[in-house]
């Protein structure tokens, strides 16, 4: 079986800020946009989390919960630089690395000879090297399957690791709450609970067709993971599957005419981003577009359509249709995205550079 490590840095952006400014240690801090600009938190440290703060929370709400919060601006160039340094440490042990974001990655160490081939010791050494050389802590999960490695990395956070050995998989999965499965969000978890499904063992004893009927593609993933099946490999080059832009508005809007103006600006940015990330890709190959709205109550809705050209008119048509879902609610964010083709040629042309 494979030996997979999932490394997840602990409150990465905030940890870098505390490392570089020790006077922040022990105080509630967050990294994100200002409240007056309707910003949201990118991350926060554990002191701030004690007040109920979390990533993606509006900055205004964060200050209501924690009036003494220290808010710092996002310093992306610095975070990318540190991420590259972490990546260099990974390379000492394996070249099979799949970055998920600046602070998170899968490593396949199946063929590594480091630490006598022990994935557990490799994870320990990586975490120690990150701390010794960069002054940051990381958590890690070690398992034969990708989704289990990711779940394991959350078991002993912060600054810890957890191992799921091959002979432990069956027992671990049987007792695993379904809400822990990657891709199962709050709403899906509630739907599963309403059906009397709480753990993977419950899925193992139910009819597969019923699950697929209720949850479609996600149901297939839930079924597979609940039976200990995850055939995904660690991919050294993650493929860029979509390109998108979005904007949190300075003020909520409730009129479609206002949204059209913002849509036109976002469309120009989307075309620019497509040309940057996919310089050799013909727009005629793109036929699936989407529009996203976030309401004032933070609920999100998305509408995607196939067979549409990448034109402003296409996005205006989708916006008109999705606007009906607002049902009188104000809009705080508008987003556009384009799904990229899944041909071999396009995959070689378009790759993520997260490190």
UniProtKB/Swiss-Prot annotation:
Residues 4-185 form the UmuC domain. The keyword Nucleotidyltransferase applies. Its EC number is 2.7.7.7. The active site is at 104. Its cofactor is Mg(2+). GO terms for biological process: DNA-templated DNA replication; error-prone translesion synthesis; SOS response. The record marks 13 as: Substrate discrimination. This is DNA polymerase IV. It comes from Pasteurella multocida (strain Pm70). The gene is dinB.
